[in-house]
Regions:
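Glycine-rich, often proline-containing surface loops adjacent to acidic residues and nearby aromatics
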Residues: 43-48, 102-116
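Short small-residue beta-strand/loop micro-motif enriched in glycine and branched aliphatics
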Residues: 45-47, 56-60, 119
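Short, internal acidic amphipathic alpha-helical interface segments
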Residues: 51-107
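Ampiphathic alpha-helical segments that act as solvent-exposed interaction surfaces
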Residues: 66-87, 116-149
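Short, well-structured beta-strand
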Residues: 101-109, 128, 133-135
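Short, highly charged C-terminal tails/helix-capping segments
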Residues: 141-198
Length: 198
């Protein structure tokens, strides 16, 4: 299905999935990586893509946060509104500080499920395209507001903290689960409180 559209893809080994593909879309050097997964025991295809924010752009965000916190809050609010208006599922990762998760935008994820009863080639391709345009919109917002950056991905505190919390000392790791377990930590709406947006 994907090869007829000249989309590059590579199958990944994943014991939690019946199928796990890494694809590049759109064609050409500006393509981004997307994941297409059929989780075991589910009647759906999950399509998603993660974007890390450039380290130089994160530094510029920190400057704006210090110089004009209202401008920063408004910019972040508008980004959230843009993601909501796109109609896709999304999650953002903000930098951590002593006072909480109020740092710069470090990464964001866009995703969308397609249930088998609605799965067609057209629906899969339109989903990938919709996710791409959602990503592209936020990427352009970041570049417009904070420049091109330094060309190197910046840190993502959530990922570092997750790595540290999964390391075990003194006891073996539990066996790998046979079913897909959903990580709700990146879901939008969990404990929804608009005050947390600031």
């Amino acid at each position: 299905m994907l090869s007829t559209e000249r989309i590059e893809f590579k199958e990944q080994s994943d014991p939690r999935a019946d199928l796990h593909l890494l694809i590049k879309y759109p064609l050409g050097e500006n393509g981004h990586k997307f994941v297409v997964i059929i989780p075991k025991g589910r009647d759906l295809v999950a399509v998603s893509s993660m974007t890390r924010v450039d380290g130089g752009q994160q530094d510029k965000m920190k400057e704006v946060m210090e110089e004009d916190s209202d401008e920063w809050k408004n910019w972040l609010h508008e980004c959230r509104m843009q993601l909501i208006a796109s109609g896709v599922d999304w999650g953002i990762h903000l930098g951590h500080s002593k006072s909480g998760r109020n740092g710069p935008l470090q990464a964001f994820n866009v995703s969308e499920p397609i249930w088998f009863d609605g799965l067609t080639k057209n629906e899969l391709m339109q989903t990938i395209r919709r996710l791409w345009l959602s990503k592209l919109g936020l990427i352009h917002e970041i570049k417009f507001a904070f420049g091109k950056g330094n060309g190197k991905p910046g840190p993502v505190d959530d990922w570092e903290n997750k790595k540290q919390s999964t390391q075990r000392i003194g006891s073996p790791s539990p066996p790998k689960p046979k079913q897909v377990h959903i990580d709700e930590s990146m879901s939008f709406g969990d404990g929804f409180d608009p005050e947390d947006w600031i």
